[in-house]
Amino acid sequence: MADRLSRSRRRLIQAGLALTAGAAAQPRFALAAAAGARTLRIGYQKGPLSLLKARGTLQDKLATLGVNVTWTEFPSGPPQLEALNAGSIDFGDVGEAPPIFALAAGAPLVYYAQTPAGPSTEAVVVAKDSPVRTFADLRGKRIALVKGSNTHFLLVRLLQAAKLDHADVKPVWLSPSDARAAFENRSVDAWIIWDPFLAVVQQTLGARIVADGTGLVENRSYYFTSRAYAQRNADVLGVAVSELTTVQRWLDANRAQGAAEFSKLWGIPEPAVALAFRRARFGVEPVTRETLAYQQHIADVFYQAGILPKRVDVSQAAPPTLA
């Protein structure tokens, strides 16, 4: 398995690395003229892409290929994939559920790379003085979360594990910022959220975790693109994945320094970022057939629960690099 993953990773970045090496030996303006004007429009959330943007290494390397990079921040995954479907971005990162809803809506997305699983990086939290002790105690209660996000799938799995029906709880669909306000003013009884928002509410409000994703979900992040962009710009995506890999490896080896940097980037207290980083698993991996099988499982669970109006075939979103 390790050899197969290594080969897949090499295929994923090979085109980009080869062209980058060639670019170093030629004048930048000549390459830009030869390649024509190209753009990589990146959507990102609070994660490693934030650091990649701040460091500027991706912009510098892609400039040698005549590629301009633009960045747009999003509060969560679903609006990122809406932007992809609308043709507004080319690349980004989302959790494990948004691609399913995007595929159901006809988005031409491709899973391009993934991170290691991080089930403990999303959780259900309640106020520190709440009488709720288990997820089952939330029967009849109002739960804030982002519709179509990774936390939506966690809600479904928590309901299954507690042997509750969807009608037994009252989802309140809110963005992370609106959910934070609702949680703080007690207009909801619980909040299902991911890091770093999870760590912040623990650190600043003393929120208590009732359940996390351990044993229920994988909770990976996925780097996505459109099929058309992948077919035309394998070199660009190869460089992007290579630079992301460098950033993620650095974060894995320098968590304390990374927490300090992200605290400044995000405007979040450093202890909260450090808490989130203690739960995080950094890295970039190639998408595998096992990955797609798990994503198909998510799609099937949503369909069987009546959340999706039709079945989704995840195989249509397989990356061109899949062996």
What are these regions (language model features)?
Residues 56, 60, 82, 86, ...:
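Solvent-exposed, polar/charged alpha-helical surfaces in well-ordered, non-transmembrane soluble domains
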Residues 232-307:
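Secondary-structure end/capping motifs
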Residues 4-5, 11-33:
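N-terminal export signals
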Residues 302-323:
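Conserved C-terminal helix/tail region of periplasmic/extracytoplasmic solute-binding proteins
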Residues 68-70, 166-169, 266-277, 309-315:
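Short, surface-exposed acidic
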Residues 62, 88, 93, 103, ...:
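Sec/Tat-exported extracytoplasmic proteins
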Residues 97, 171-172, 177-262:
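Pocket-lining segment of extracytoplasmic ligand-binding domains
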Residues 33-165, 172-173, 189-192, 210, ...:
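Short, glycine-/small- and polar/acidic-enriched structural segments
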